[in-house]
């Protein structure tokens, strides 16, 4: 059994890349359909009105409107409140 490590070996130097998780659109912000609202691992935030959930638990807007965060039965929900179309 060797008592010295071979040349250029190290027990350090391994770390995973940051996954850029978190809330991407905050309460009151206007979003378009399809925009990502929250990137997460597990359901820290649950989908509410007009919000879909992807296979990796990412929450995204199903309709255009304003983001709203709320709590129901100790669950944090993300909703999209549709904004009425303004006649030009």
Curated annotation (Swiss-Prot):
Record-linked Pfam families: Ribosomal_L27
InterPro entries assigned: Ribosomal_bL27, Ribosomal_bL27_CS
PROSITE patterns: RIBOSOMAL_L27
Top-level lineage group: Bacteria
GO molecular function, one term: structural constituent of ribosome
Region (Disordered): 1-26
Regions that span the bilayer: none
Entry GO CC: cytosolic large ribosomal subunit
Biological processes annotated in GO: translation
Gene3D superfamilies hit by this protein: 2.40.50.100
Keyword entries, A-Z: Ribonucleoprotein, Ribosomal protein
PANTHER family: LARGE RIBOSOMAL SUBUNIT PROTEIN BL27M, RIBOSOMAL PROTEIN L27
Record-linked HAMAP family: Ribosomal_bL27
Family designation: Belongs to the bacterial ribosomal protein bL27 family.
Entry protein name: Large ribosomal subunit protein bL27
Organism name: Corynebacterium glutamicum (strain ATCC 13032 / DSM 20300 / JCM 1318 / BCRC 11384 / CCUG 27702 / LMG 3730 / NBRC 12168 / NCIMB 10025 / NRRL B-2784 / 534)
UniProt gene name: rpmA
């Amino acid at each position: 059994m060797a008592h010295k490590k071979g040349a250029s070996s190290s027990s350090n130097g391994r770390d995973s890349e940051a996954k850029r998780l978190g809330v991407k659109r905050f309460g009151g912000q206007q979003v378009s359909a399809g925009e990502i609202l929250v990137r997460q691992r597990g359901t820290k935030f649950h989908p509410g009105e007009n919000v879909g959930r992807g296979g990796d638990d990412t929450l995204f807007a199903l309709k255009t409107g304003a983001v709203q965060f709320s709590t129901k039965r100790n669950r944090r929900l993300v909703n999209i409140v549709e904004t009425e179309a303004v006649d030009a």
